[in-house]
């Protein structure tokens, strides 16, 4: 175990961004080399993840980095000599140089192990976080701007974007290094730089660089668990099962402490107080890196806002966006680190963690909000007046009910001549619910405030009472976002949309019939979908081909012949979503590959057009054929970038959420 990883207990940052990795000695062990050739699209379909990561690395870092990453993705953890055995055309020193760059960009993690003979070996692991940062690099820069006030903090926006660009390009950055690159800045500019760093650190987009960023989660868990297990006394009467459970409980506490402290560095707090001005500033000697988990929370919020827009409406989705932006920083992450350790093979552990996360969604400080909180943060150009249906709609229903033809009732007299009055009209249950709903949305039509609390509360009630639980109410007037129950619905809805748009509405109809009925026969599907039997069979064959549904054979008798069996159909969403994820991954990688091929085929023309003496004078210095070809290249590249953005928004739902 290296010094950086040993410093995880207690916390310590990796010195020099992990540059000390290459100085360790590797053993001479080697395995039989197996060439990895993904030149053809057929071979790339065997591992779409490897295809995507290799293309990303090739487009951003070059051919050598792409080759090294491909080996690590396909073969797992390897030492430098083992990597060299798979890539003999690269020298050992070149591989080490590439690994240093990949480690600094968080594309590779490492761990030092000591064998029984005492020999220390550094093993390298592929880390997809660095590739995700490359994949989202453009959107990260644009999304950061949304967290600044465009009117009052425009001077900080450009600085914040430059800081993020430098952090993504270098992997990590200190305030001191950034100020050194801005040596010509005056005192006002330096103050603004400090304020931009403070703002990004407050939002947790920048966090201190720690050993956890370079350590594989699974190996970290194994180290903590073995350490706690070895501490237990061996001469006690406790069973081995109790010892393991005790060690597991202690290791979980230490593991959660390590992975859930992004705002602390190894030497103390990240924030300091400037003795001269009294303002808060970031410690200039602390290495900062980008917090991918925090950014993915904002991507999740954007997906939920678009989902609410399609189901509730545009105005309510804007209210929802403000509520999510208030709470996303303190909300649960997309996945808990313990889910990557293998503990979820135990059903009790999985259930316990899921219950804890559900409680955190409601009880953690900063995750709940009220209508007043949302109203204070609404944009000034948003006018909510006239966006809700008022209670006068219920009056129309009452009038319609009163205008119904009268029902003549028989008059009943008692023995003494008393006439029994008719029974009062009982309102139906549906009408009562409608009146209750109207009462909840009973607003003042003469309200002059376009962003009043009553209007905001009306939209929150729409989100609360919808069939999809966009928000829930923990206390009267206090709401929270139930991510654990909302994300599965988002996945199913996205999957249905893809099926409907690619395979047609008939496939979507059959898929919904099977989902609603569970395990069902072909006759049941034909009856409920109101389709012909021949069409149903064709659609079922297509859905089975794409792993959207599964076939289960149920024998009717002891005879197992196929002719005497009944075939039922069901949906297993885990398998269906995984197939869709692999499909989208391959298409995304293929699109990136085509864009890179387009640039390579027109490299000479692009190089000529990007020369300083040609820019702005293309019509004068380029031939007509070159101008036409340049226009074709630009159009194809723009079209490819739009398609990439759309694919990315679909891919992340199944890959990251």
Swiss-Prot record:
Gene3D superfamilies: Winged helix-like DNA-binding domain superfamily/Winged helix DNA-binding domain
Function summary: DNA-dependent RNA polymerase catalyzes the transcription of DNA into RNA using the four ribonucleoside triphosphates as substrates. Specific core component of RNA polymerase III which synthesizes small RNAs, such as 5S rRNA and tRNAs.
Gene: RPC82
GO molecular function: single-stranded DNA binding
Name of the molecule in the record: DNA-directed RNA polymerase III subunit RPC3
Stated family: Belongs to the RNA polymerase beta chain family.
Pfam families: HTH_9 (PF08221), POLR3C_WHD (PF22536), RNA_pol_Rpc82 (PF05645), RPC3_helical (PF20912)
Subcellular location: Nucleus
Record carries keyword Nucleus: yes
Region (Disordered): 390-450
Acidic residues bias spans: 428-448
